[in-house]
């Protein structure tokens, strides 16, 4: 994945979830696609998805459990994980997570 996004629009207003434990900004591309870039501070949270997502981790460490799974999987900076559409996942952030969420 690239280290920067060129020729994009960034929504100035932050998306703040879970009392500030997750903060992101929306990035809009000329082709109509959208991504969010943000951080998740150490916590355990549950996210619901509409569109399928690819979570690209730039830095930090977390454990995730997809809907219906019993086991947790560990991910860290330089890795990514996929979340199906209309689903959910639990995330335990061990070290502050710097991420890009790609909506697919």
From Swiss-Prot:
<dbReference type="GO" id="GO:0009032">
    <property type="term" value="F:thymidine phosphorylase activity"/>
</dbReference>
<comment type="similarity">
    <text>Belongs to the nucleoside phosphorylase PpnP family.</text>
</comment>
<dbReference type="InterPro" id="IPR014710">
    <property type="entry name" value="RmlC-like_jellyroll"/>
</dbReference>
<comment type="function">
    <text>Catalyzes the phosphorolysis of diverse nucleosides, yielding D-ribose 1-phosphate and the respective free bases. Can use uridine, adenosine, guanosine, cytidine, thymidine, inosine and xanthosine as substrates. Also catalyzes the reverse reactions.</text>
</comment>
<dbReference type="GO" id="GO:0047975">
    <property type="term" value="F:guanosine phosphorylase activity"/>
</dbReference>
<keyword id="KW-0808">Transferase</keyword>
<dbReference type="GO" id="GO:0005829">
    <property type="term" value="C:cytosol"/>
</dbReference>
<protein>
    <recommendedName>
        <fullName>Pyrimidine/purine nucleoside phosphorylase</fullName>
        <ecNumber>2.4.2.1</ecNumber>
        <ecNumber>2.4.2.2</ecNumber>
    </recommendedName>
</protein>
<dbReference type="GO" id="GO:0004731">
    <property type="term" value="F:purine-nucleoside phosphorylase activity"/>
</dbReference>
<dbReference type="InterPro" id="IPR009664">
    <property type="entry name" value="Ppnp"/>
</dbReference>
<dbReference type="GO" id="GO:0004850">
    <property type="term" value="F:uridine phosphorylase activity"/>
</dbReference>
<dbReference type="InterPro" id="IPR011051">
    <property type="entry name" value="RmlC_Cupin_sf"/>
</dbReference>
<keyword id="KW-0328">Glycosyltransferase</keyword>
<dbReference type="Pfam" id="PF06865">
    <property type="entry name" value="Ppnp"/>
</dbReference>
């Amino acid at each position: 994945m690239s280290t920067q996004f060129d020729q994009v629009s960034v929504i100035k207003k932050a998306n703040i979830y879970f009392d500030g434990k997750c903060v992101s900004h929306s990035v809009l591309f000329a082709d109509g696609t959208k991504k969010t870039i943000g951080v998740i501070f150490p916590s355990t949270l549950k996210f619901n998805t509409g569109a399928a997502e690819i979570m690209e981790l730039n830095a930090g460490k977390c454990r995730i459990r997809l809907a219906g799974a019993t086991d947790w999987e560990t991910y860290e900076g330089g890795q990514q994980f996929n979340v199906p559409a209309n689903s959910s996942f639990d995330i335990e952030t061990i070290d502050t997570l710097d991420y890009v969420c790609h909506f697919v």
